Amino acid sequence: MNNNIINLIAAIILSLSIIFGWQYFVVKPEQKKQQQQIAVQKAENLKKQQLKALVEPATGIVVQEESQVQRIKIESESLTGSVSLKGLRFDDLILKKYKQDLSKNSPEVRLFSPANTENAYFAEVGLVSNLSSVKLPNNDTIWNSDSEILSPEKPVHLFWVNEDGVKFLVTITVDENYLFTIEQTIVNNSDKELPVQSYGLINRKYIAVEKAVNILHQGPIGCIDENLKEYSYDDIKDKKSEKFAASKVDWIGITDKYWLSSLIPDKSSNYSSNFNYALKQGTERYQVDFISPVQIIKPGENFSIKSRIFAGAKKVDLLDKYEKQYDIKLFDRAIDFGWFYIITKPVFYAMNFFYGYVGNFGVSILIVTVIIKLLMFTLANKSYRSMKKMKNLQPEIDRIKNLYSDDKARLNQEIMALYKKEKVNPVAGCLPILVQIPVFFSIYKVLYVTIEMRQAPFYGWIKDLSAPDPTTIFNLFGLLPFSPPSFLMIGAWPILMAITMFLQQKMSPEPADPMQAQVMKFMPLIFLFMFSSFPVGLLIYWSWNNILSIIQQYYINKFN
């Protein structure tokens, strides 16, 4: 193989080693340190008094603490919780289909919590006016309701009348998944014009999140003027506020790894929107909000506006459905598919398709890997032939190098003439490697960010494809009664990956350069330690890919 090609492959491997080495040796220890800091911070927060005020949105609305008031119970196939009738706030929401962990008695995932709790997180929509004389419902308003339960079969109708006789009506519906629709209607029975603006906000007490290097976005997010806007918590903290004036707002919200809360305003107008940070009495709070232009409601007229709140799991097919049904631009990008979006999402679709037949995402990964191998077989065959030719030409290349060692231009000219004469493409040998890089990262992304892979089992001891292999050779895979430190958690699947990688190397032509050949021999061992902390689903893919490559190499060797 030409030294330039060897150098290219070595550079690719070195780059991957640096990326994943940083993840393993730098990010992981930092995460452990952060987790300790989080534990200390939580202990301190328990001692703090209840908060008196939250972040103020650009509208001037002050989100205040809630007393014990009547609530409307939320009950659907996917959600349980309640809506506060004081201020009409969505602040109590549990995702019924998801557990916090794999333990037997694990509680369900809680998304929203009231403002006076440790993990405060809530959403609300409402009305404001630029005239203080206009009496509108506010955070202290107690709404009247025609029902105590909100379900997909039974919407809730709320009403409130101010001292001037103006009626405010709200209809709330929820579907079988995670979408609330809130329609606000104003019936102006007064003799005055009413200038009003509709707003929506999501407010969250800061919770330290797992930090990852260019792997996953968590924090404020939205689609504004058909462009995806993503800001980390640190970005907003530094800026204090990121404002967008008179923009087309498809949706704004706050995203976690698997969960999303977002506001979806009515498409009838543009909106001003903000991503905000505030420190109140030692507590950090983040808020996203929007506000509409002023709407003048004349005496005797009615005015209605509709908003939606999504609060739940970021299921790919569900976000796709809402995006199409309600024309919500880039809603699926709430899932951080990464740089290789155009590859990652089709890879997920393929895995999900086969999952529908086999009922196991691990098996689905195996099937998709076989399909990818078949699609790349012709390319791999041509690559192998080119590598063999390069290997056979190496003595002649060495002779040319010795002959023209003092004339670099003539040296390159003679080598290129040799390639042309023998019909050899010096780049062909590395094409399969280059093609596999985006596929590898796409599968990694699918395993890391999609809710469908969360707590998805394989067979045997693998209960979660998105988590590392829980076994380790250093306690004989659980036979010895102790738990090694995290950097020694080298399980059965990482070992299988390293073994198959070693066998694959044995069947491939060795680099002509002895030093490079020696480096390549150590790569399985290096990757063994680097990838032991990666999602086991990725190791299953890589091990199976290596096995298929060995079979493919055997076939090519036999028939070529």
Swiss-Prot record:
Keywords, A to Z, come to: Cell inner membrane, Cell membrane, Chaperone, Membrane, Protein transport, Transmembrane, Transmembrane helix, Transport
Chief location category:
membrane
Q: Identify its membrane topology class.
A: Multi-pass membrane protein
Out of the domains of life, which is the source? Bacteria
User: Which InterPro entries did the record assign?
Assistant: Membr_insert_YidC, Membr_insert_YidC_N, YidC/ALB3/OXA1/COX18, YidC/Oxa/ALB_C, YidC_ALB_C, YidC_periplasmic_sf
Q: Does the keyword Transferase apply?
A: no
| Pfam short name (any one) | 60KD_IMP
Q: Does the keyword Chaperone apply?
A: yes
Sorted alphabetically, the Gene Ontology cellular component annotations on this record are: plasma membrane
Compartments where located? Cell inner membrane
GO molecular-function term, one example from the UniProt record = membrane insertase activity
Gene Ontology BP, a term: protein transport
Family, per entry: Belongs to the OXA1/ALB3/YidC family. Type 1 subfamily.
The role this protein plays is: Required for the insertion and/or proper folding and/or complex formation of integral membrane proteins into the membrane. Involved in integration of membrane proteins that insert both dependently and independently of the Sec translocase complex, as well as at least some lipoproteins. Aids folding of multispanning membrane proteins.
Q: Quaternary form?
A: Interacts with the Sec translocase complex via SecD. Specifically interacts with transmembrane segments of nascent integral membrane proteins during membrane integration.
- Name under which the protein is recorded: Membrane protein insertase YidC
Biological source species: Rickettsia peacockii (strain Rustic)
**Gene from which the chain derives:** yidC
